[in-house]
């Protein structure tokens, strides 16, 4: 396709591609410009350690994949996407060889939680059953007219609670509290923050509703399928093309930017209305991530073998330990025992490594922009629950916050969330209004995870922004 274009999308991450696909489905001529040599943003796979070992650069487990209303309606399997479902979505080891598992089956999970099983069912069963209605409400801007008010109210009354408050109300056993802490800590918020429970509620409900699957072959498989579908619709993706100024773009009726607020300020500058520019200037980043990838000569030697039943493992010990880790990060300190999110893809997808070998993906939260190397402390947490792990390491890759940003400009300071996900910035993302994607400049839209519904690989930020453009510009 050659100019003229109807719409230009800046950034070929999942939200940018979702925006482009939505526009192309409506008959618009669309081109996507991507600074990196490969599309995907945080949804890419790279040989980070040794040849033949395929590691996910960013997102590695996809609870929103089959649950996203946008992804679910696309024929991505036609382009090679296949979801692999582990035996269990999640494992959480504890000291003494114990472990608690989140099973796809709510019944099996309840059975493993002893005296907390009934309370767990009472908390999660309504969200699991009502997920399609809840998704319709929470995966769009906060300011809207609800269609499913009872389901939204039931979810919202729990979601508004801080992580600790919900734990104290719902659970008594160390196992149930630890399972909740590990999932809720995906929010990267202090456990005292209002609204922090929303992330854990959604993620655990999705674990029961659709699982936490991984794409066969790596995260790149999802990106490649999205690109292929866009091209089948007549769209185009141009990689290796950095956009530094809107004035350098071809003429188009609409520009949708899958970029950080900081980049939008650089691109649009004084074109933006003062109130919107002020909102972007005041945007607060979340904490950063420090990421390790490993090539192993065998599987992780877990003390509790049930940990090998899940692709995702949360390492951090008890509720109180994980709470302390997230508090330290929020206060600008490096945790002594960090909360570690780990994925062991090759147990379920051996195509990602040479025969008999394995990959491990792991990261921990650190203060924004931290330059402290915490490789040893992350490895110590793995070794704590899998003695002998270090002996199986062939090679490792270290991506500190600065390296993450070099790989993906949207990860400013190593923040993988598109900005803090506290209650204020979930509501005003980046502005509180019915259409938070419109910038105030006709035809210019923000469509990154710094817009509703925020972080996660679901494509809904791009989809919602494209619908706004179709209504306002092409309607």
Residue ranges and their predicted role:
Residues 447-470:
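A conserved FAD-binding loop/helix module that cradles the flavin
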Residues 1-7, 25-26, 207, 425-426, ...:
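Extreme N-terminal leader/targeting segments of oxidoreductases
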Residues 235, 241-353:
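Mid-domain catalytic core of redox enzymes
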Residues 203-244:
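Helical element adjacent to the flavin cofactor pocket in flavoenzyme catalytic cores
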Residues 95-194:
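Rossmann-like flavin
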Residues 119, 299-300, 333-336, 370-409:
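Flavin-binding catalytic cores
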Residues 3-133, 420:
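N-terminal glycine-rich phosphate/pyrophosphate-binding loop and immediately adjacent elements
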Residues 173-190, 336-341, 388-452:
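A glycine-rich dinucleotide-binding beta-alpha-beta segment and adjacent secondary-structure elements
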């Amino acid at each position: 396709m050659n100019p003229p274009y109807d719409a230009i999308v800046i950034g070929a991450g999942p939200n940018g591609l979702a925006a482009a696909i939505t526009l192309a489905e409506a008959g618009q001529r669309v081109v996507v410009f991507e600074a990196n040599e490969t599309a995907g943003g945080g949804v890419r796979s790279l040989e980070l350690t040794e040849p033949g070992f395929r590691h996910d650069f960013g997102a590695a487990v996809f609870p929103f994949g089959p649950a996203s209303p946008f992804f679910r309606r696309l024929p991505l399997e036609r382009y090679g996407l296949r979801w692999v479902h582990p035996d269990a979505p999640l494992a959480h080891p504890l000291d003494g060889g114990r472990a608690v598992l989140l099973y796809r089956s709510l019944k099996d999970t309840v059975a493993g939680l002893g005296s907390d099983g009934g309370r767990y069912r009472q908390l999660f069963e309504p969200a699991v059953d009502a997920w399609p209605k809840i998704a319709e409400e929470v995966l769009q801007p906060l300011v809207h007219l609800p269609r499913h008010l009872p389901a939204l109210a039931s979810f919202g009354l729990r979601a508004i609670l801080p992580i600790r408050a919900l734990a104290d109300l719902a659970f008594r056993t160390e196992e149930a509290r630890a399972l909740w802490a590990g999932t809720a800590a995906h929010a990267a918020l202090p456990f005292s923050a209002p609204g922090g429970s929303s992330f854990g509620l959604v993620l655990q409900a999705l674990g029961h509703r659709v699982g936490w699957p991984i794409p066969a072959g790596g995260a790149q498989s999802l990106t490649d399928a999205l690109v292929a579908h866009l091209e089948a619709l007549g769209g185009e993706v141009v990689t290796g093309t950095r956009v530094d100024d809107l004035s350098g773009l071809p003429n188009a009726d609409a520009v949708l930017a899958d970029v950080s607020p900081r980049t939008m300020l650089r691109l649009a500058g004084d074109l933006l209305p003062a109130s919107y520019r002020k909102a972007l200037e005041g945007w607060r980043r979340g904490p950063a991530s420090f990421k390790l990838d490993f090539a192993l000569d065998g599987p992780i030697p877990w003390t509790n073998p049930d940990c090998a039943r899940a692709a995702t493992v949360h390492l951090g010990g008890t509720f109180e330990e994980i709470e302390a880790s997230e508090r330290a990060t929020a206060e600008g300190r490096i945790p002594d025992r960090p909360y570690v999110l780990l994925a062991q893809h090759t147990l379920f997808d051996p195509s990602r490594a040479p025969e008999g070998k394995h990959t491990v993906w792991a990261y921990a939260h650190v203060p924004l922009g931290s330059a402290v190397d915490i490789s040893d402390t992350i490895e110590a947490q793995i070794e704590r629950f899998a003695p002998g792990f270090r002996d199986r390491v062939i090679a490792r890759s270290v991506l500190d916050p600065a390296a993450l940003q070099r790989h993906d400009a949207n990860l400013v300071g190593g923040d993988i969330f598109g900005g803090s996900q506290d209650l204020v910035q979930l509501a005003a993302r980046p502005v509180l209004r019915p259409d938070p994607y419109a910038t105030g400049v006709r035809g210019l839209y923000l469509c990154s995870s710094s817009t509703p519904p925020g972080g996660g690989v679901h494509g809904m930020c791009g989809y919602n922004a494209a619908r706004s453009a179709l209504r306002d510009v092409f309607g």
